[in-house]
Amino acid sequence: MAQNVEQQVAQLQQLQQQLSSIVAQKQQLELQLREIERALKELDEIEEDTKVYKTVGGLLIEADRDEVKEELEDRKETLELRVKTLEKQEKRLQQQIENLQKRLQKALQQAEGGGGAGAA
């Protein structure tokens, strides 16, 4: 019984680490999404003949405004899909963690109850 509980505790810790990693990844992607949304807003607000630059490697190069906007919209769409995927993984892991916590709690209660009944 104790070995099974130890395995479940180890599994719980592993799931919690995975959840933490997914949450961190999701936060990074959401930050990138906000930056892209700000850039798209700025592109919408500037005059069409305003010079636009984009970063390529360590350089800033002049680029076509519409082309930059299209690239940003594509990137935004990709990031939104990745965030949705991570959200699904996050929910699935949260459910697994919750189920495992319930099983662990039940196993510990049975262990305590079994020990008390044997002593009586």
Curated annotation (Swiss-Prot):
Molecular chaperone capable of stabilizing a range of proteins. Seems to fulfill an ATP-independent, HSP70-like function in archaeal de novo protein folding. This is Prefoldin subunit beta. Heterohexamer of two alpha and four beta subunits. HAMAP family: PfdB. It is found in: Cytoplasm. Its main location: cytoplasm. Keywords: Chaperone, Cytoplasm.
